[in-house]
Amino acid sequence: KELLDADGDILRNGGPAYPGLMPGVERDLPASGWGLPRRTGDESCPLNVKAVR
């Protein structure tokens, strides 16, 4: 799996913007396979990370 930030840069799994490992962020992946992390109260979480499945 790879993650792209708002600029399209690949972020490594487990990196600071990896929503699957970041507390307070859940991945919301619709049938298309794309999703944005949902804000769940952790103010340190980025809002512009796209998860790639």
From Swiss-Prot:
Query: Which controlled-vocabulary keywords does the entry list?
Result: Disulfide bond, Protease inhibitor, Serine protease inhibitor
Q: What does this protein do?
A: Inhibits trypsin with a Ki of 0.25 uM. Inhibits the trypsin-like proteases in midguts of larval H.armigera, S.exigua, and P.rapae.
Q: Where is this region: Disordered?
A: 33-53
Q: How does it assemble?
A: Heterodimer of an alpha and a beta chain linked by a disulfide bond.
Q: How does activity depend on temperature?
A: Retains almost 100% of its activity after heating for 10 minutes at 70 degrees Celsius, activity is lost rapidly above 70 degrees Celsius.
What superkingdom heads the lineage? Eukaryota
Lineage in the entry? Eukaryota, Viridiplantae, Streptophyta, Embryophyta, Tracheophyta
- A GO molecular function held by the record: serine-type endopeptidase inhibitor activity
Q: What protein does this entry describe?
A: Kunitz-type trypsin inhibitor alpha chain
- The residue range of the signal peptide is none
